[in-house]
Amino acid sequence: MTITQVKIKKLENFSGSLPEYATEHSAGMDLIAANEQPITIKAAAIQLIPTGIAIALPDSFEAQIRPRSGLAVKHGITVANSPGTIDADYRGEIKVILINLGKEDFIIEKGMRIAQMIIAKYERILWEESISLMETMRGSGGFGSTGV
């Protein structure tokens, strides 16, 4: 396995520990809330939650912000734009857009694990316009065409 080093900066509001893998085979690292005061996410509402970190990803890498399954299943708290994308040239604070799909208000406390961050390599492409596309068995079937 290749290990890529990524620079990370602790901002003034940083609290707790840097994102880290929970197990040897974890794909994502937990992000920690760095809000000074508790933030209430009302039912059906969205809040932007600070993490207190900024990163410098290498070219051809992105960070994906995804929900934590425990928050989603127990409280209906998920990432509104999942997966959120942090581009390699972004140097500002990583913030997480959380939405409360539950029926009750939910309070985000400083130090709470709020989301997962996955670092992924990607390729850029160039479009090649074409009059036709190669046929496949699936064709243009979509939105449930391969079964439920």
UniProtKB/Swiss-Prot annotation:
InterPro entries, per this entry?
A: dUTPase, dUTPase-like, dUTPase-like_sf, dUTPase_trimeric
- As recorded in UniProt, coiled-coil segments are none
Q: Which UniProt keywords apply?
A: Hydrolase, Magnesium, Metal-binding, Nucleotide metabolism
Reaction(s) the record says it catalyses: dUTP + H2O = dUMP + diphosphate + H(+)
Do you know which SUPFAM superfamilies this protein is assigned to? dUTPase-like
Q: Which residues bind substrate?
A: 68-70, 81, 85-87, 95
Name a GO molecular-function annotation: magnesium ion binding
Against Pfam families, the record matches this protein to: dUTPase
Query: Per its UniProt entry, what is the enzyme's top EC class, as one word?
Result: hydrolase
Q: Which cofactor does it need?
A: Mg(2+)
Biological or metabolic pathway of the protein: Pyrimidine metabolism; dUMP biosynthesis; dUMP from dCTP (dUTP route): step 2/2
Q: What is its EC number?
A: 3.6.1.23
* GO BP: any one term: dUMP biosynthetic process
**Which cysteines in this chain are paired by disulphide bridges?**
none
Q: What does this protein do?
A: This enzyme is involved in nucleotide metabolism: it produces dUMP, the immediate precursor of thymidine nucleotides and it decreases the intracellular concentration of dUTP so that uracil cannot be incorporated into DNA.
Query: Per its UniProt record, what HAMAP family does this chain match?
Result: dUTPase_bact
**Similarity comment: family membership:** Belongs to the dUTPase family.
The name under which this protein is listed is Deoxyuridine 5'-triphosphate nucleotidohydrolase
Native species = Rickettsia rickettsii (strain Sheila Smith)
